[in-house]
Amino acid sequence: MDLLEGLPITVKVRGNWDDCVLEALDGVYGLEDPQEIQLLRLTQYLMERLDTRYIDWLRSLPLLDKIEVDGLRFSLSHNLPDKNYGGALQVTNETSNFDHLLDEETDIAVYGHVHKQLLRYGSQGQQIINPGTIGMPYFDWESLKNHRAQYAVIEVEEGELVNIQFRKVAYDYEAELELAKEKGLPFIEMYQELRREDNYPGHNKELLTSLIKKHDYVEDVKDFLQKIKNES
């Protein structure tokens, strides 16, 4: 967070994983669902390392923000303007779904969430861009799979969109994995599969249940829930 704070970022929006952290801190989750236990344990890990002032900052972020760059009007949202979760904007969905990103005051809509780079048009001709993902790329076509971090560069000159570049950058995936191990990241087995196989088994409840039992995460989470209760 300190690194992000030092960058000249002009627009920030709140994503679904941000809300998961806030919901964990607000006592929304319990000990019955393995996915909720996972979110609680990851939030606990985060809070052991994060200045609490960033939580207030996180709560203040909007779902949608707009910015004008040299006359071109951009909207930015994690997913839909009023919903930062769900599958409405999967890249092969109908154009009518993507029209929800657009209005008469938007020339270009930028969104994230689906972990895939995309350029397409709304039904009235505005452009829609997804820059992709830094650390969790999803590929349906096996030959296109790769680990590289994704981003996009949009160039505007004198009110005109002159260039869009979708980029992928390699980094040392094993070094990143070793760093996560050194820092004691919970559910490290799942992170290892993500880094090495480009597969994140986050919806595999059987795997989650086995890892929770293996590492006794329930006891960790019980202590965390009690701490949250005491501080509320």
Give names to the regions the model predicted:
Residues 1-49:
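Core catalytic region of metal-dependent phosphoesterases/phosphodiesterases
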Residues 10, 64, 186-188:
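A general structural signal for well-ordered secondary-structure junctions
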Residues 26, 31-33, 59, 161, ...:
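Short leucine-rich amphipathic alpha-helices used at interfaces
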Residues 41, 46-167:
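Acidic, His/Gly-enriched loop-helix segments that form or flank divalent-metal centers
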Residues 19-20, 116, 195:
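Positions that flank functional sites
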Residues 23-28, 88, 141-142, 177-179:
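Short aromatic-enriched loop/helix-cap "lid" or pocket-rim segments at secondary-structure transitions
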Residues 124-232:
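Acidic, His/Gly-rich catalytic cores of divalent-metal-dependent hydrolytic chemistry
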